[in-house]
From Swiss-Prot:
Top-rank taxon: Eukaryota
Residue ranges of every copy of the Cupin type-1 domain listed in the record: 13-162
Entry similarity comment: Belongs to the 11S seed storage protein (globulins) family.
Protein name, UniProt field: 13S globulin basic chain
Keyword set includes Disulfide bond: yes
Subunit structure: Hexamer; each subunit is composed of an acidic and a basic chain derived from a single precursor and linked by a disulfide bond.
GO molecular function terms noted in the UniProt entry: nutrient reservoir activity
UniProt xrefs under InterPro entries: 11S_seedstore_pln, Cupin_1, RmlC-like_jellyroll, RmlC_Cupin_sf, Seed_Storage-Functional
Entry-linked Gene3D superfamilies: Jelly Rolls (2.60.120.10)
Role, per record: Seed storage protein with a relatively high level of Lys and Met.
Tissues showing expression: Cotyledons and endosperm protein bodies.
Length: 194
């Protein structure tokens, strides 16, 4: 019965281990999450956790939390963090250091860029299966939007719309030197046609 389920429930998850990373970029860092899929005990708490380890100047792509608020505690290093509210206004734009805590509300966009010494943090989220939506990179929603719509919406050229859609091949963790060549952009466009 229920006693048997509680007694056999997994109660620990190592989110510090590099082998457990959910996202990894050898030039930018790694992100590991603990949610109710990995650790069912979190379902009853309605919480999840994320551990970020960004290398020197690594970037966690701009994204927003779809279904959770986030409390981010810096465990080592420093980073430039920008948070933008749901109406497009900047609500935070500063450096955070070891020992500091920052709250990022649901739907607010956030970007983190590690300092020269790198950046490590733990974020606690108010949903047992917290989800994010990246604004750039291979997993960005912009990839699904036709170029004509992007050009019209943002009043940009065809080249700028193409760069917005295909400019970064990385998924979530970005490095400063990660801009891909035009050939890869063209190859990606060609693949999406089929």
């Amino acid at each position: 019965g229920i006693d048997e389920n509680v007694c056999t429930m997994k109660l620990r998850e190592n989110i510090k281990s590099p082998q457990e990373a959910d996202f990894y970029n050898p030039k930018a860092g790694r992100i590991t999450t603990a949610n109710s899929q990995k650790l069912p005990a979190l379902r009853s708490l309605q919480m999840s956790a994320e551990r970020g380890f960004l290398y020197s100047n690594g970037i966690y792509a701009p994204h927003w939390n779809i279904n959770a608020h986030s409390a981010l505690y810096v465990t080592r290093g420093n980073a430039k963090v920008q948070v933008v509210g749901d109406e497009g206004n900047k609500v935070f734009d500063d450096e955070v250091k070891q020992g500091q805590l920052i709250i990022v509300p649901q739907y607010f966009a956030v970007i983190k860029k590690a300092g020269n010494q790198g950046f490590e943090y733990v974020a606690f989220k108010t949903n047992d299966n917290a989800m994010i939506n990246p604004l750039v990179g291979r997993l960005s929603a912009f990839r699904a939007i036709p170029e004509e719509v992007l050009r019209s919406s943002f009043q940009i050229s065809s080249e700028e719309a193409e760069e917005l859609k295909y400019g970064r091949q990385e998924a979530l963790l970005l490095s400063e030197q990660s801009q891909q060549g035009k050939r890869e952009v063209a190859d990606e466009k060609e693949r999406e046609r089929f």
